[in-house]
Amino acid sequence: DFQEFITDYCWHQVWDKKHLSNKQKSFNNLCILASTNKWPEFKLHLNGAINNGCNFYELKELFLQIAVYCGVPTGVECFKHAEEFFKLSDIDINEEMS
């Protein structure tokens, strides 16, 4: 029941709205999840962000902005978790984001 509620609410009622692009929704989610230290969900939404058209350069800028507004340790965590995620995906994040 709970999973059904979450799926219906998040995906059908919120994500189906049309005023923000899915890419923008992904950026918003990454910011919110980073600022609240929800790192497992952050990594999950990294995959969604890539699927929604976010590129490495945009993510780098996003993480820098997160570092400014949420604190450098949070920005460091963003880069750390992104590096782990992309390593598992066989993408060299250091090369892509340098």
Please give the residue ranges for each predicted region.
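Short, structured motif recognition centered on aromatic/hydrophobic residues
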Residues: 25-33, 63
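Mid-chain, well-packed structural core segment of small domains
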Residues: 35-60
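A generic alpha-helix surface/boundary motif
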Residues: 4-9, 26, 42-44, 60
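Short amphipathic alpha-helical surface patches that mediate protein-protein
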Residues: 64-67, 83
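Short alpha-helix boundary/capping elements
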Residues: 10, 32-38, 71
